[in-house]
Amino acid sequence: MYNIGMDKNFKVRVIVGLTMFVVALIGLYTFDSIPFKIIFGLFAGMSIVELFSFFKKKHRVFNIVLVLFETLFLILGTVFVARVDLNHFWYIILGVCGYDIFAYLFGKLFGGKVFKKSRPFPHISKNKTWEGTFLGLATSITLVAIKMGVQRSFETDWMFLLSGPLALCGDLFESFLKRQFGVKDSNEIIIKNKFFKFLELFVGGSEGHGGYLDRVDSTAFTGTVLLIIILVSYTPW
């Protein structure tokens, strides 16, 4: 059986999930405080710096529009996530991290056993498997649904069930953007960017940075779409 415990990418996902969990715990006591918003804004700022590193690759108008578009949803999504109350913040954390960790875990354990060599997104993210995608989404939705069931908040919070699927969409858009610019992953950008060198002191090398930034991107994408849904449906939050 595949040794998940020794897989670096899985460890990165777990570390990212735990980090966001710790951020949520900090928010439990300081959610409206300036330090909490600074921490969250720092993650978003790192992602924006990463995005503008893409300009070194190509300068076509289409690529610039893509970067500006993702920068827009990074800003909107981060503002939304930073302003929601703690209860809804937890929904987003459960949805995004639940999908990411379990999609990777189930993909490694069961990937290819049912759908063989077939891949759901071969031209965007060839390593994703049907098994991992389905089970990751199911786990994410289940975690959010359990929380809603306990709080009996389905009627007002139903849109947060989309946190996992939206995280997948954000991840795919990020993968598309990287392919468009000929970048394999966030690590490649960060290794070449001196701005991120100091992070190696805290996360033990460059392997973890891409994981952090990708999760911020997914969270921001999720936040942006949820904000649009809430504004359109006039649901209070």
Positions of PLM-derived features:
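Interhelical loop and helix-boundary elements at the membrane-water interface
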Residues: 1-18, 27, 49-225
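Hydrophobic core segments of transmembrane alpha-helices in multi-pass, intramembrane catalytic enzymes
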Residues: 20, 41-44, 222
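Loop-to-helix transition at the N-terminal end of transmembrane alpha-helices
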Residues: 34-51
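Juxtamembrane boundary at the C-terminal end of a transmembrane helix
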Residues: 228-237
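Juxtamembrane helix-loop transition sites at the ends of transmembrane segments
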Residues: 34, 153, 192, 235-236
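Short, hydrophobic transmembrane alpha-helix segments
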Residues: 24-37, 54
